[in-house]
């Protein structure tokens, strides 16, 4: 075997050498005999672990490139990895689809559930609104019934009081008549009078009348619950996103949403009511206003024995029934209000008549040529509200217990001379303790028929008529006209239009004072026995005198001329060149005194966004302490400033800081648009009327020489209506650096962006003092004549 292998090896070598050395080797090579193909070379296992293989060429295939089995293994491994990933993604996709389907189903179920809940809630809201409105209506009916019963109780109190007065007067009249008989009656009738029992009854009745029967202010007006649909449920920034939302989410917009608002009439709250939109529809609305700390009362019912209102332009003495503005009436008592009373209407009030505690005469024990008669009539006014000043047609009252009295004395001296030249001289003098006017001289004339006459006494007691006829037949008819005349205090409070009338001044600090009204008549007769026969043909010469005070021009004149003028209070004035007498509040304590209050804001209870006519006539009310909100009236401002005046503006912020500004001041006539003329500023608040706002520009914000503007009569320099935007009548330019008639915002600083619909600084502002976005707590405007006038 070994030899065979050696032989094969030798043959192979020989064959190779022979082939190389042959001459035909070119033909062999040309036929491809010398070409070698690639040889498969198995690499070591360690060489296949390399991962960075370059591109393989034919020359590099054997010693660098991996084998096909290795490549297939790598390909299979990568394919398996990708397959696993794809399967994992498919499983996740299936899970997400299943979860999405479940979530959609759950969302639809939730939306259906919420839709049902919203529908039920909407029904509940509607039911709640109806029930609350029905409850409010029933409470309102109950409140009106309570007020009606209170008025009936007051009427009964008035009747009881009048009956007590009549009983006491009857007792006094009987006693007077018995004592006037001078012997004959005293022998026939032995009688004693006890007035202490009546005084005790009077005190008890006064205590009963003093009790407050009407609801308090916080219970006087029930808040109203208003429900309205929300217009924009989805904010504008989310509306675009809602378009891309699923249909079930869009169903939320179809659900109706309601807004509930609690409105309190006459208060700043859920609905303030003094915005331009609200006030224009109710520019003459009635608001219950009174000073802080005062007891609440019905706006048109001052309460039992209340002193009532002073209405500029009204005159008349106490008339039976209702007392209407601008009407006059005869003596009487009864309801006193702006309209006829009706159950629950809160207008009208049965007020007890002013007491007149009787009439008596005193005669001496011996006869004399001259006879003296005294008529004593005392008038006591017990009120549940101090003296008040009412401007315009507002129905406002302020309470506080006070008793005021008025004392007047009328003396008549009658002299009759001898029989041959008999004549009668009558001298009449009317005086009062406080120097006030006592009214017309004819009010207490002897020719009036008095309620305490003998005729009336005989009518009340017919069983004693024979006694009076027998014993008093010879008495002069003049002696029969005893009694008293009921004189209601309403003629004092409403007769301010007549120049002859005078409103007595009461000290605002006094709470109780004693009063009596005396009428003294003296007759001197020369021949009493034959007076009836000779009196028919006598010639009568009557001289009647009456002392009348000159009407005061303003508060400074009140300070100089009236005894009670040094105290703050309400007084009656008559400006020069005017035939109108009206009532004003005088401040006699500030600076030199003599200040006349023309405007005041203190609690935001009164709406100042009024019409031109309202600002012309004035509106609002004040009590005798100067508490309340009001505007005196542009007509009165023009009359009071014709001769030049000083304007004082007093400001107070919510921290208690005070400031003032004073100007030379004049207001033009209505034909001039009530143009404002101001100059000569001095003070601590800053010059807002002449200089205006420096930042906004004086030419745009100065109020000097500007006409008065209201929302229904635009006279400003702006292309729009400043009064409508800023919420009150004022002397606007384009538009303001001060506005004391703006909207009252409690708390001071306010955000104008919340002031719908104008989003502007429309508060009670004085820009140099606290800025345009700060609404002041209290402001007052006062005037007085220039020094030297």
Swiss-Prot record:
| UniProt keyword terms in alphabetical order | Adaptive immunity, Blood coagulation, Calcium, Coiled coil, Disulfide bond, Glycoprotein, Hemostasis, Hydroxylation, Immunity, Innate immunity, Metal-binding, Phosphoprotein, Secreted, Signal
Where is the site Cleavage? 36-37, 101-102, 122-125
Residues modified as 4-hydroxyproline? 504
Q: How is it modified after translation?
A: Conversion of fibrinogen to fibrin is triggered by thrombin, which cleaves fibrinopeptides A and B from alpha and beta chains, and thus exposes the N-terminal polymerization sites responsible for the formation of the soft clot. The soft clot is converted into the hard clot by factor XIIIA which catalyzes the epsilon-(gamma-glutamyl)lysine cross-linking between gamma chains (stronger) and between alpha chains (weaker) of different monomers. Forms F13A-mediated cross-links between a glutamine and the epsilon-amino group of a lysine residue, forming fibronectin-fibrinogen heteropolymers.
Q: In which tissues is it expressed?
A: Expressed in liver.
Coiled coil regions in record: 69-554
Q: Which InterPro entries match?
A: FIB_ANG-like, Fibrinogen-like_C, Fibrinogen_a/b/g_C_1, Fibrinogen_a/b/g_C_dom, Fibrinogen_a/b/g_coil_dom, Fibrinogen_aC, Fibrinogen_CS
Q: Where is this region: Disordered?
A: 263-420, 526-555
A single Gene Ontology CC term: fibrinogen complex
Instruction: Specify the glycosylation sites in chain numbering.
Output: 609
Signal peptide as annotated in the record: 1-19
Q: Where is the composition biased (Polar residues)?
A: 397-416
Taking every annotated instance into account, which residue ranges of this chain make up the domain Fibrinogen C-terminal?
546-787
Q: Name one GO biological process term.
A: platelet activation
Q: Where in the cell is it found?
A: Secreted
Q: What happens when the gene is disrupted?
A: Knockout mice are viable but only males are fertile. Neonates frequently develop spontaneous hemorrhages, but in spite of this over 90% of mice survive the neonatal period. However only half survive beyond 70 days of age; lethality is most often due to intra-abdominal hemorrhage. Pregnancy in female mice fails at around 10 days of gestation, associated with severe intrauterine bleeding. Secondary loss of FGB and FGG from circulating blood is observed, although FGB and FGG mRNA is normally expressed in hepatocytes (thought to be the main site of fibrinogen synthesis).
Q: Which GO terms describe its molecular function?
A: metal ion binding; signaling receptor binding
Query: Residues where Phosphoserine occurs?
Result: 46, 447
What function is annotated for this protein?
Cleaved by the protease thrombin to yield monomers which, together with fibrinogen beta (FGB) and fibrinogen gamma (FGG), polymerize to form an insoluble fibrin matrix. Fibrin has a major function in hemostasis as one of the primary components of blood clots. In addition, functions during the early stages of wound repair to stabilize the lesion and guide cell migration during re-epithelialization. Was originally thought to be essential for platelet aggregation, based on in vitro studies using anticoagulated blood.
Q: How does it assemble?
A: Heterohexamer; disulfide linked. Contains 2 sets of 3 non-identical chains (alpha, beta and gamma). The 2 heterotrimers are in head to head conformation with the N-termini in a small central domain.
Q: Domain annotation text? A: A long coiled coil structure formed by 3 polypeptide chains connects the central nodule to the C-terminal domains (distal nodules). The long C-terminal ends of the alpha chains fold back, contributing a fourth strand to the coiled coil structure.
Q: What is this protein called?
A: Fibrinogen alpha chain
Its source organism is Mus musculus
């Amino acid at each position: 075997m070994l030899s065979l292998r050696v032989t094969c090896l030798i043959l192979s070598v020989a064959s190779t050498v022979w082939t190389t050395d042959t001459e035909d080797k070119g033909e062999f090579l040309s036929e491809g005999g010398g070409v070698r193909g690639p040889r498969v070379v198995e690499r070591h296992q360690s060489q296949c672990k390399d991962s960075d293989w370059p591109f393989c060429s034919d020359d590099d295939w054997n010693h660098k490139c991996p084998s096909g089995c290795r490549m297939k293994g790598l390909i299979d491994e990568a394919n398996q990895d990708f397959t696993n990933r794809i399967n994992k993604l498919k499983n996740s996709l299936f899970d997400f689809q299943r979860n999405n389907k479940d979530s959609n189903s759950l969302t639809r179920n939730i939306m259906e559930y919420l839709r049902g809940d919203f529908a039920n809630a909407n029904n509940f809201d509607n039911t709640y609104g109806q029930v609350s409105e029905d409850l409010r209506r029933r409470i309102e009916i109950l409140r009106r019934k309570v007020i009606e019963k209170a008025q009936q109780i007051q009427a009964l109190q008035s009747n009881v009081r009048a009956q007590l007065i009549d009983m006491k007067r009857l007792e006094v009249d009987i006693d007077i008549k018995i004592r006037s008989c001078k012997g004959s009656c005293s022998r026939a009738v032995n009688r004693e009078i006890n007035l202490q029992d009546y005084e005790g009854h009077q005190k008890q009745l006064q205590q009963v009348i003093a009790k407050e029967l009407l609801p308090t202010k916080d219970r006087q007006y029930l808040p109203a619950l208003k429900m309205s649909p929300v217009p924009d449920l989805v904010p504008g920034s989310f509306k675009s996103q809602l378009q891309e939302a699923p249909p079930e989410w869009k169903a939320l917009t179809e659900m109706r949403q309601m807004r509930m608002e609690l409105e309190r009439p006459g208060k700043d709250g859920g609905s303030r009511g003094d915005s331009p939109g609200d006030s224009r529809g109710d520019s003459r609305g009635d608001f219950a206003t009174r000073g802080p700390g005062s007891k609440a009362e019905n706006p048109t019912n001052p309460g039992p024995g209340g002193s009532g209102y002073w209405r500029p332009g009204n005159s008349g003495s106490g008339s039976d029934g209702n007392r209407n503005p601008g009407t006059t009436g005869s003596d009487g008592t009864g309801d006193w209000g702006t309209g006829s009373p009706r159950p629950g209407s809160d207008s009208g009030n049965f007020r007890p008549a002013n007491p007149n505690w009787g009439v008596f005469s005193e005669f001496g024990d011996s006869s004399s040529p001259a006879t003296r008669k005294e008529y004593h009539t005392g008038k006591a006014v017990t009120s549940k509200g101090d003296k008040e000043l009412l401007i315009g047609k507002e129905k406002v009252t302020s309470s506080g217990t006070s008793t005021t009295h008025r004392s007047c004395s009328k003396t008549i001296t009658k002299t009759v001379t001898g029989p041959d030249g008999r004549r009668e001289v009558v001298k009449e003098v009317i005086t009062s303790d406080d120097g006030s006017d006592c009214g017309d001289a004819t009010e207490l004339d002897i020719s009036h028929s008095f309620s305490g006459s003998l005729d009336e006494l005989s009518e009340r007691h017919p069983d004693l008529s024979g006694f009076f006829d027998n014993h008093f037949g010879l008495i002069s008819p003049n002696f029969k006209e005893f009694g008293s005349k009921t004189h209601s205090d309403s003629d004092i409070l409403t007769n301010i239009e007549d120049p002859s009338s005078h409103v007595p001044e009461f000290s605002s600090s006094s709470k109780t004072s004693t009063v009596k009204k005396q009428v003294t008549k003296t007759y001197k007769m020369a021949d009493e026995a034959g007076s009836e026969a000779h009196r028919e043909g006598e010639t009568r010469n009557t001289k009647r005198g009456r002392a009348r005070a000159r009407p005061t021009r303003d508060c400074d004149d009140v300070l100089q001329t009236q005894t009670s003028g040094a105290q703050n209070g309400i007084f009656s004035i008559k400006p020069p060149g005017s035939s109108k007498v009206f009532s004003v509040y005088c401040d006699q304590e500030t600076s030199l005194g003599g200040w006349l209050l023309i405007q005041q804001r203190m609690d935001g209870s009164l709406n100042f966004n009024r019409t031109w006519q309202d600002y012309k006539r004035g509106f609002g009310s004040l009590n005798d302490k100067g508490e309340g909100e009001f505007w005196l009236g542009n007509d009165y401002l023009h009359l009071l400033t014709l001769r030049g005046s000083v304007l004082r503006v007093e400001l107070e912020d919510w921290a208690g800081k005070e400031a003032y500004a004073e100007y030379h001041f004049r207001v033009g006539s209505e034909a001039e648009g009530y143009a404002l003329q101001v100059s000569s500023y001095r003070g601590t608040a800053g010059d807002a009327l002449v200089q205006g706002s420096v930042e906004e520009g004086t030419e745009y914000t100065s109020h000097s020489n500007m006409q008065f503007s209201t929302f229904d009569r635009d006279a400003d320099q702006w292309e729009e209506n400043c009064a409508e935007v800023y919420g009150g009548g004022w002397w606007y330019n384009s538009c303001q650096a001060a506005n004391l008639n703006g909207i009252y915002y409690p708390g001071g600083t306010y955000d104008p962006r919340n002031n719908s619909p104008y989003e502007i600084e429309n508060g009670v502002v004085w820009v140099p003092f606290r800025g345009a976005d700060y609404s002041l707590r209290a402001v007052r405007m006062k005037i007085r004549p220039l020094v030297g006038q």
